């Protein structure tokens, strides 16, 4: 475990308690195709939808009622599109060919708000702010999601990376902005800026930096090809992987726990590694534990339960519920049939999205979507859709 103390390090009391962070995990560096993204609604929505979910399919978006799973709206949108919670009760961020667009999922229509830029990448929600990272330009946009309801682009903070790269950024409760460092060819670590975008900390001991998550007490982590890098209370700490190459590229955090859930890959030469182990990173003890599930999973398989429990959708079709403190698999909740991760990261595969105590799991092979009660393990609702879905998300208020 290695520490680096930043110049002008923050003194005094620890940072404010963290609130939950939702990670946008990804399996590659491109976030859209070359098709022009023009949204065409299939019909005029009659009423607002409750707790909407948004799923992508080849050619558009499905909007579903979060309680009944009724398909309430189909929006035609060419290209490879991605979806993430915007941070309020109504909106979802849609990554398209032209940039980030804001969908009013409750009203079932796109707003006029767009953050244009090539290769829109990670979307991060934390401490009352939503942060967008545009890979093609290195631009970071920060805004209060509560302002999205005003119908125009929120006033917010902007920062442009020294060089464009596949990156991620997060604004902390005290106004510090952590953003990754790199180029299109090489990513090396992260820096931290104060409220005036002046650098106050830096660590370049994180090769291949990718992904982000926050744990309790605002311990913010980014993944490396040889472990994980944590920023907390004004300083960086590196937790080394047990293998020379131990990549933790996707992570999921919870404000209910100091322990992060991550993937874990050990073969740098693999065209597609299908790992069976996940990582549990204790941000308090600065330790890393590996848990072997016995089955593989994908970057769309990681989530957290309402009490901080680690959830992994395995290729056996079950949600593996892991006690994040002991590393023990407590139970397996049947969700879908067995599946295999496709070589192309943009191709559909079963996806896990968790909101409160409900797990939503898509099954592209059956064109199905299921809602599962995490407490009872029972499927409460299922629906068959016209087309196979790819990404799955929904509105999530708060952080």
Regions inferred by a protein language model and the residue ranges of each:
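C-terminal motif of bacterial Sec signal peptides marking the signal peptidase cleavage site
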Residues: 22-25
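Bacterial signal peptide processing site
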Residues: 27-30
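Repeated scaffold domains used in trafficking and secretory/extracellular systems
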Residues: 38-46, 77-90, 114-129, 159-174, ...
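Short beta-strand elements that form the blades of beta-propeller/WD-repeat-like
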Residues: 48-57, 61, 84-101, 123-142, ...
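A short beta-strand motif characteristic of beta-propeller blades
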Residues: 67-76, 106-115, 149-161, 197-204, ...
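Acidic, serine/threonine- and glycine-rich low-complexity intrinsically disordered segments
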Residues: 184-305
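Loop/turn-rich, solvent-exposed surfaces of beta-rich toroidal or solenoidal domains
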Residues: 294-337, 341-364
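Blade-level signature of beta-propeller repeat domains, shared across WD40, Kelch, NHL, RCC1
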Residues: 362-399
């Amino acid at each position: 475990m290695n520490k680096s103390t930043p110049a002008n390090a923050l003194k005094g009391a620890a940072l404010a308690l963290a609130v939950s962070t939702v990670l946008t995990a990804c399996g590659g560096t491109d976030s859209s195709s070359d098709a022009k993204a023009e949204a065409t609604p299939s019909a005029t929505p009659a009423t607002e939808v409750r707790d909407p979910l948004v799923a992508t399919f080849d050619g558009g978006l499905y909007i579903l009622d979060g309680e009944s799973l009724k398909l309430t709206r189909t929006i035609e949108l060419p290209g490879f599109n991605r979806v993430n919670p915007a941070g309020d009760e109504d909106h979802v961020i849609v990554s398209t060919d032209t940039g980030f667009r804001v969908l009013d999922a409750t009203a079932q229509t796109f707003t006029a708000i767009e953050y244009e830029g090539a290769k829109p990448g990670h979307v991060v929600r934390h401490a009352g702010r939503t942060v967008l990272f545009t890979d093609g330009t290195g631009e970071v946009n920060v805004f209060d999601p509560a302002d999205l309801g005003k119908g125009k682009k929120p006033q917010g903070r902007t920062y442009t990376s020294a060089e464009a790269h596949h990156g991620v950024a997060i604004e902390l409760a005290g106004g510090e902005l952590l953003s990754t460092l790199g180029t299109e060819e090489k990513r090396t670590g992260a820096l931290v800026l104060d409220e005036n975008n002046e650098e106050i900390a830096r660590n370049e001991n994180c090769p291949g930096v990718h992904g982000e998550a926050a744990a309790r007490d605002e311990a913010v982590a980014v993944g490396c090809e040889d472990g994980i890098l944590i920023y907390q209370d004004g300083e960086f700490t590196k937790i080394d992987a047990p293998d020379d190459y131990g990549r933790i590229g996707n992570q999921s955090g919870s404000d209910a726990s100091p322990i992060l859930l991550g993937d874990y890959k050990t073969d740098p030469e693999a065209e597609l590694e299908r790992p069976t182990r996940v990582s549990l990173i204790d941000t308090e003890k600065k330790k890393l534990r590996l848990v072997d599930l016995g089955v593989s999973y994908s970057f769309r398989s990681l989530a957290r339960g309402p009490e901080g429990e680690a959830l992994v959708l395995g290729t056996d079709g079950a949600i593996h519920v892991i006690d994040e403190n002991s590393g023990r698999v407590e139970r397996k909740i049947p969700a879908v049939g067995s599946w295999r991760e496709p070589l192309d990261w943009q191709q559909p595969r079963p996806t896990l999205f968790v909101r409160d105590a409900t797990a939503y799991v898509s099954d592209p092979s059956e064109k199905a979507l299921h809602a599962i009660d995490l407490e009872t393990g029972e499927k409460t609702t299922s629906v068959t859709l016209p087309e196979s879905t790819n990404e799955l998300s929904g509105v999530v208020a708060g952080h």
